[in-house]
Amino acid sequence: MAAELTSTRLNAENHLLLDQPLLRLPHELARRNFKSVQRLVEREKEYVLPALKETANASLSNEQTPDQALAALDAMISRMQGLKRKMENLHQEERKIQEQSRKRIQHLEKLHQIPSLADVQYDQWARVRLDRLMIDHMLRSGYIKSAQQLAREKGIEDLVDLNVFVQCQRIAESLRTGETKDALQWCGENKAALKKSQYNLEFELRLQQYIEMVRAGHKERFNDAMIHAKRYLAPYLETQSVEIHRAAGLLAFPPDTKAEPYKSMYAHERWAYLSDLFVRTHHELLSLSSRPLLHIALSAGLSALKTPSCHSAYTSSSSNSLSTTTSVCPICSTELNELARNMPYAHHTKSYVENDPIVLPNGRIYGQQRLLEMSKKVGCVEVGKVKDPTTGEVFNEGDMKKVYIM
């Protein structure tokens, strides 16, 4: 009884290991929102305070007419009103983030109130988490509208990161179509954070702009490309010297060159590379997992079930269609076979085998009694024959051989 209670007791801390991004992202968004407020206040303070002091001194010394002083004050008031509007927008954004965080914390707190895995409340909570993981997977796969619809139907908009992934997909798609404007704007908004990134996204975007200028192939664009390189590429000379020297070599090679590395630099596949690089950088800055959370959740279960035979040449789902239609092993299924390919095998300290094992001519081993019973249940097997439940092959009972385990 004690062992049974232990096996069904809910360990909330272990469950929450998978849900860390649920609170990490709102925290990161709140931090960035605060930094935006800080930058706005500092920028306006640097302008308004000196301007106010200068206007006051000029008025006292009669260097300005009353109309000039009023015009200067109007300009400062206009800037402060603009600051107020921006601050109000940021305040509304902060309230949204706080409300989102509150609902996410409430969702996680429910787990600590569930005593057992057998409790019906756990089934309800796990269903919500599965919906979250599905929406996360759809967002990362580009099925934005489907993800939004599912979130609305389930009423969990605040538990998923719709807006973040919508923006990410929009910018990634613009890069695939050959447009750098949105990505560069995003880099400008996150300039401070990008300095700590392991990726060099902004440099790669500026390099692509340079490549497109050189691709045009006429003198005026060459001049523009050199000016662009001095302004945007030269600051990276210490860290990206090899790429910058290669970029300079592009001036001597036409877009249809076969010489490497210039052929690869001119290749249109670079846009797909930039799109993937942006997604990796975006996820890194927002502390998002590079893999879908659904894959991470499945990994533990896949590893616990995986055996060496799951990816053998004979039973592989990619090479044996008959096997996939009859096998009940999740690892051998078409949907999960590739996902589990790089997972480690299950670590079993004990083996469980039938007490009457036999081997069929195709090398497969089964319990004799269970195999005979299954063959009878199938009904389409002749008397004195048995059917392999995995491959569907039929053999004579006399072809079965006893297996001895040493």
UniProtKB/Swiss-Prot annotation:
Q: Which UniProt keywords apply?
A: Cytoplasm, Metal-binding, Nucleus, Zinc, Zinc-finger
Q: Where are the zinc fingers (RING-Gid-type)?
A: 329-391
- Its GO biological process terms? negative regulation of gluconeogenesis; proteasome-mediated ubiquitin-dependent protein catabolic process
- GO cellular component terms given for this protein: cytoplasm; GID complex; nucleus
A single MF term (Gene Ontology): ubiquitin protein ligase activity
Domain CTLH span(s) in chain numbering = 164-221
Domain LisH span(s) in chain numbering: 126-158
Tell me if NAD is a UniProt keyword of this record.
no
Stretches assigned to coiled coil: none
Q: Which domain of life is it from?
A: Eukaryota
Q: Which Pfam families match?
A: CTLH (PF10607)
PROSITE patterns for the chain = CTLH, LISH, ZF_RING_GID
Subcellular compartments: Cytoplasm; Nucleus
Q: Describe the task this protein carries out.
A: Involved in the proteasome-dependent degradation of fructose-1,6-bisphosphatase.
Give the record's family classification.
Belongs to the FYV10 family.
Supply the name of the protein. Protein fyv10
Which source organism? Aspergillus niger (strain ATCC MYA-4892 / CBS 513.88 / FGSC A1513)
